[in-house]
Every structure is written in C-alpha cells, then in structure tokens.
Amino acid sequence: MTSAPPPAKPLLYLDVDGVLNPVCPRPGSGYTRHRLLRSEVLLSSAHGGWLRELSEVYELAWASTWEAWANRCIAPLLGLPDLPWVACGGVNSGAPEGDFAPIMRHAAGRPFAWVDDLIPPRLLRRYADRSDVLLLPVEPGQGLRRRHVDRLLSRPPRAARVSSGPPGPRPSESAPSPRRPG
C-alpha cells in the first residue's frame, strides 16, 4: 500500500523594505548597513537565522519591489538560497492592495502567510477568520521581530477543509430497500 505524499508546506511571502530593512531602526538594534543598488539597506543577521528556521515549516518567497534583486542582493547577506519571487513592482508599485493580487495568483489555492509593513486594514479584516491565509503586519520602524516568527511558527496557515457537497440523507431518511424477487 502506498501512502499519499505529504502536503506541501504553506507559502511565506516576505517583503524586504519595512520588514527585513526597517525604516529608521533604533541605533544599536543589531542592524548592519549595506550599500545595495545605490541605496542604503539595513539588515540584521538574526533575520537570516529566523528565516532559515521558518523554512522548516514554510516555503519562503519574496513579495517585494526588489523582485529578483532580492535573490541577488538580500539573500546572500542573510545566508539564504535563491527563493521564488512574486512580481510586486509593476504598475501598482507602492500600493499594497496591488501586491495582494499577484500573491493570490502565485499561491494558487495553497495556504500562505504574508509578512509586510503595508497590509491594508481592509484585507486584515477580510482574512482575519481564515485558516488558510495569515496576514501579518510589521511595524516598518522595527521590522521583523522574534514575536512575528513565533506567531508564524505557532499557527501556520493550513488548507481549508472543503466539503464534497451537501450532506447525504441520514440512514433513517434513505429510501426503502427494494424487495427481493420472490
């Protein structure tokens, strides 16, 4: 007897700016300055360890205007392999609502978590009770913290149970059995 393959890990979509690269972090908060693509980027080595820990439960993916550049510039500094990425830098660049549609398309029905500093409150309300979607906002001045990692690890999104249709009749409600020919 063959067993079914294990279910795929939920996806974890990560923004860079405001999440891994906080806006104006406190001095001495463990961030190192890097000059990348003519911009100054602050990264914490703790994030690399946390993301590797999360990769045991999740399939990581970039959801950032950095797009493929995140693999070239950010991943090596955090000790991460190349990750899949979602195109979030198009026409709606800078509009968080515009980032959500490409994430939904990429997830293609798989459970996922999205960590971003600009998740619209309307989306937070809309998906608050879903077991297959976790939207985790991060304060852009602080970036990703251990409490966010703990939340992601404690209750990862899981596939929603799907009904195979309306329940069938109860045994007492079923049609009588036909008589055997006598």
Residue ranges and their predicted role:
Residues M1-L11, P171-R180:
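N-terminal intrinsically disordered, low-complexity tails enriched in polar/charged
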Residues T2-G94:
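Alpha-helical substrate-recognition element adjacent to the catalytic core
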Residues N71-G182:
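C-terminal cap/substrate-recognition subdomain and adjoining C-terminal extension
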